[in-house]
Every structure is written in C-alpha cells, then in structure tokens.
Amino acid sequence: MTETAIPDVQSSPDKRHIAINRVGIRDLRLPLFIENAAGEAMPTVARAALMVALPHTQKGTHMSRFIRLLDLKTPISVSALPTLHQKMLDTLHAEEGTISLSFPFFIEKSAPVSGEKALLDYEVVLAVDGNRKHVEVSVEVTVPVTSLCPCSKEISQYGAHNQRSHIVIYAQYNPNQPFSIEDLIHIAEEGASCPIWSLLKRPDEKYITERAYEHPKFVEDIVRDIAMVLNDDPRISFYRISSENFESIHNHSAFALIEHQK
C-alpha cells in the first residue's frame, strides 16, 4: 500500500503577490525562567508573541515552528535576545521578525529599617525586532512607587498628599553591553519620592513617610530626573519614560511623558 503525501498548503505559491509585514503567533502563555542580574533563574509565566515577515511569493508561514523556539528549561536573559531572534529567522526561513515576552518579574526586597524580606512584582516586556543584519533590543518595566506633591507640602502647615504611582520606562539598548531588568527598575525607584515594599513594620512606615516628604515630586519632576540619568547612560540609544500618579485628592490621574532618540 502506497502512502499518500499530505499536502503542504502554506508552502505553496501565492498568486496575489502581496508581502505581509508580520505573521505568527501572539498571546502564547507559557512558563519560563528569566535570568536576573545575579545570573539566577527566576520562574515566571510569560505571554509571548513571535512573528516574521512573509514574502509575497509564499502563501503562509510555518505556525507550529514558533512554539518550538522557546526552550522552557533554559533561562532567558536580556543579552540572549539577539541569539533567539536569529534562531527564529533561521527556523522560519525569514529575513526579519519580532519577538516579545511580557511577564511579571519578582524581586526580593528588604524593608528599609526592619530588614523584613518579601517579594515585589514588576511588569516587564522584553522585545527584539529587526532583520539578519540589524536588531533593536528593548526592555520595558512598569515600576510602582510613591509620589508626594510639592505644592501640597509647600502650602500646608503639616502633611502633604501622596499617592501610589506607576513609572514606565521603555529603553532600547546596545546588545553588546551588559544590561539587566533590575537596572531600569532601580533607576525608576530612585526617580520617585520613595520606592515601595510589600512587607513593612512600623519603623519602615515611618521611614517611607518621612523619605517621601523629604523628596516631593510632580510627575514632571519624576520623568525629568529619570531622563537625566538615561541621557548619561551610554548603553541606551532611545528611551520613553512615563509617570502616572493615581491622585489621592482627585478622581483622575496626573501624567507626564518624555521620549528621546540619542
């Protein structure tokens, strides 16, 4: 009995001759290990998007090949993104493409006075985009912080309104230089009135309250202070910073954004 060959429809020619910029899979949820600055493998659950350009001559891409690209046992580092991108292009026989991984990233933080330890989560997006000759690698972090209003402090006899804020930093960097997720998180926290912690005792709360009061900042101050740090960082070629204060005395947020191509 002769076996009948199964048709490979997606590899057949396409008569419309229209190229597709990106085709692939998105919102693929899977467990991964992310390498932190200390070289440790941190477990998380990521949402992945993997896409390539499709030439006008080809009907479809090989969707099943995207799934095999991500090795669930090997930790993914920021520095490994260009290699993963090249592997995707080779596997899909493509000339350009994009990979994006979004996930919660946990850091064990010690409370500022008591030293009590607990995990704090940050939203992170790692991405690489480009062709066989040039790629752009980016890291985006969303960092929760505390902000305290300078105007409120100035006009009040005691106290000042403060609130939780989100700082988002998106940075494209030189893949040939060492760079970590924690680098951007640290820059964001230093740019706020005060960082936040998951576990605090009374001495820690006193410290946070007083530190925020001593470092009042508008959203404008936050993004400008962070921009000054990123301007001096030779590893970064482009950045976008935003700060959103979830105002405690209003039913709206305050927002500021700076982006800069070096």
UniProtKB/Swiss-Prot annotation:
The keyword Hydrolase applies. Its EC number is 3.5.4.16. The record marks C149 as: May be catalytically important. It is an enzyme of class 3 (hydrolase). Gene3D superfamilies: Urate Oxidase (3.10.270.10). GO terms for molecular function: GTP cyclohydrolase I activity. This is GTP cyclohydrolase FolE2. Signal peptide: none annotated. Keywords: Hydrolase. It comes from Dichelobacter nodosus (strain VCS1703A). PANTHER family: GTP CYCLOHYDROLASE MPTA. Pfam families: GCHY-1. Pathway: Cofactor biosynthesis; 7,8-dihydroneopterin triphosphate biosynthesis; 7,8-dihydroneopterin triphosphate from GTP: step 1/1.
